[in-house]
A protein has these predicted regions:
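A conserved helix-loop-beta module that forms one wall/lid of the active-site cleft
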Residues: 89-156
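Short amphipathic alpha-helical segments and helix-helix/interface helices
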Residues: 18-19, 111, 134, 170
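Conserved ATP-binding module of the ATP-grasp superfamily
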Residues: 120-122, 139, 143-146, 158-187
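Short beta->alpha linker loops
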Residues: 52, 79, 105, 125-131, ...
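Fold-independent oxyanion-binding glycine-rich loops
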Residues: 10-11, 31-34, 148-149, 162, ...
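CheY-like receiver
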Residues: 60-64, 135-136, 169-172
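ATP-binding N-terminal substructure of ATP-dependent carboxylate-amine bond-forming enzymes
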Residues: 1-100, 131
């Protein structure tokens, strides 16, 4: 392969992607907000931009003289499909749509789309306050699950039963959300 591959994010989970891209013959451009992110040592070029800021990322990319030689944009083990789609679209590269990326990275938007499309999904609501969480539990009972709308994996996800401290649940989930939004759903 020839050309450049842009990898959004450079955490430890992404080292394999950087190494594999290099083995495939790509020149790797890595981006991360942290200039000391572990995977950046495997990149040929480093750009400092938050993985969650699509505009800052594309501005950093376009600062490269030969940014048009980028052949693809990927991420691995990083919940930033919107940034990947945004950058790919700006560079005229194939990718999922911005709408699909937005739906896949925001659990509340995804659940609302499921509901609007008559896809069977558990009862859910956005909890903007601790009182919203209390109200949901009063209405729907236990068990339930609380999670950040924008988290990945199981970060910030809490199973709620009658022994749970709801104030702690709310603050814990919120602390794992970049958007400061959480969702509660019946389990």
């Amino acid at each position: 392969m020839e050309g450049k591959l842009l990898i959004i994010g450079a955490g430890i989970e992404q080292i394999y992607a950087y190494q594999t891209a290099k083995k495939m013959g790509f020149s790797v451009v890595g981006t991360d907000a942290n200039p000391n992110a572990p995977a950046l040592i495997y990149s040929d070029e480093k750009l400092i931009a938050s993985t969650r800021d699509p505009q800052a990322t594309i501005e950093a990319v376009k600062s490269l003289k030969d940014y048009k030689s980028i052949k693809g944009v990927i991420t691995l083990a990083n919940d930033v499909p919107y940034t990947v789609a945004y950058v790919a679209e700006a560079l005229g590269l194939p990718s999922i749509s911005l709408q699909t990326a937005a739906l896949s990275s925001d659990k509340l938007k995804m659940k609302n789309r499921f509901k609007d499309s008559d896809v069977n999904t558990p009862v859910f609501t956005e909890a903007k306050t601790y009182q919203d969480l209390q109200k949901f539990i009063q209405q729907w009972g236990y068990p339930a699950v609380a999670k950040p709308t924008d988290g990945r994996g199981s970060r910030g996800v809490v199973f709620i039963d009658e022994n749970s401290d709801l104030e702690w649940v709310f603050s814990y989930c919120l602390s794992h959300s970049c958007s400061n939004k959480i969702i509660i759903e019946k389990f």
